[in-house]
Structure formats: structure tokens, C-alpha cells
Amino acid sequence: MKELIEHIVFQLTAMHTQIEILTDLQDSSFKGKDDYWRICIENIIENAARYVHHEIKIILKDQYLEIFNDGEPIDNSNPESLFQPYEIGHKGQFGLGLSIVYKTVTMYGYKVEAVNRVDGVSFIIQRKISRMI
């Protein structure tokens, strides 16, 4: 996953020269096909680039990926709708990117959530914790 993210960041840095993209990447492997994860991560980063003020931060740890942007907070009135198809934010396009992210993440047994921070928004992907009863 680390190499995949480095490749995506390299490509996006050339396209978004006004945005600083910071990374803290550890070696980690996520279950699933790299092509699906590439599309998923590109969708989140492209979405972040639409709302960012100055910087995007990407953190990768074991079974944990966080993509932060220092843009405006997300409307929390209906957080589940964020990942629904055709749900378009105020700078959004077709409303499909985050629904693709959600489908990819859940298909491989992970969860995704959008978290408002004091200084921006984080999209966090992590392995679902299964509980033994």
C-alpha cells in the first residue's frame, strides 16, 4: 500500500502544484486488489484537493489510512449520506467518488468514516474489528 500511495501522490503533486501533500507512510498491506485501492485513494485525495486550503496529509499505518485536508468541515446533519451515490457537496461533481470508496472499502472488510477536525477533515479507512461472542 505504501508504494501505491507514493505513486498516487507523485502523480497528483504534478497536477496540484499549489497544494502541499505531506505523507507519513509505514509499510502496510491492505486486503484486496491494488487497482481497486488505487481508485479508492485517488477519489479521496481528489475530493480533498477540491476542498483543501493549503495542505493534504496522508498517514498510513498497519491496517489504517488517514487522508486529511485543511478545508472546511463536513456537514454532520446526515453523515451516512456522504457515501451515497449522487450525493453532491457544495464543490462536488457527480456524487459518485465517495460511494465508490465506500463500496471498495466495505467489500474488503474495512470501514470508512469522515471525521471533522479542529483544522479540517479526515477520511479514515481501517480494518473492521470483529468481536467474538
Name the predicted role of every residue range:
Residues 1-14:
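Short beta-to-alpha transition helix within the HATPase_c
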Residues 53-64:
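Short beta-strand/loop element within the Bergerat-fold HATPase_c
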Residues 42-43, 47:
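Conserved polar catalytic motif of the HATPase_c/GHKL fold
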Residues 54, 109-110, 114:
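Conserved glycine-rich
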Residues 74-86:
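Short conserved segment of the HATPase_c
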Residues 25, 29-35:
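Conserved micro-motifs of the catalytic ATP-binding
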